[in-house]
Amino acid sequence: MKKLLLILALAVMNSSAMAEWVRVDYNSDKGTTTYVNFFTIEKSDETVKMSILVDYKKAQERAFLPLYMSVNRQSEFSCNEEQMRELYASYHAKNMGKGKVTFSDNSPDSWSAVPPESIDRELWKHACKKLAVN
């Protein structure tokens, strides 16, 4: 199990360094910038998987996590059902998915509705537009 997590962490760190991140949102109130790597999109019949990077202006903390400056996640979007779920997330000590991985979670979340007027809605639109194109 530890070996698998190490391999996943190294793969994410390596892909972060080589990824071509495109900024899709900046929220000055929250101090976040959200990026998407369109080269990582994986399409199936009705879902799209996409890599997302959330970069923070200030270090973030949660009750059970060490401080982190960015989160690299893979999300899956159901275009017809307007739902989404997080498949994987890695929390990084530095901006843009760099630095030590302070925490990772590879347990897929349950499907949930994409909230209206949210960054997740914008991400869903980007993902599903890519599905419709091809």
Predicted regions and their residues:
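N-terminal secretory-pathway/extracellular module detecting exported/lumenal segments
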Residues: 17-134
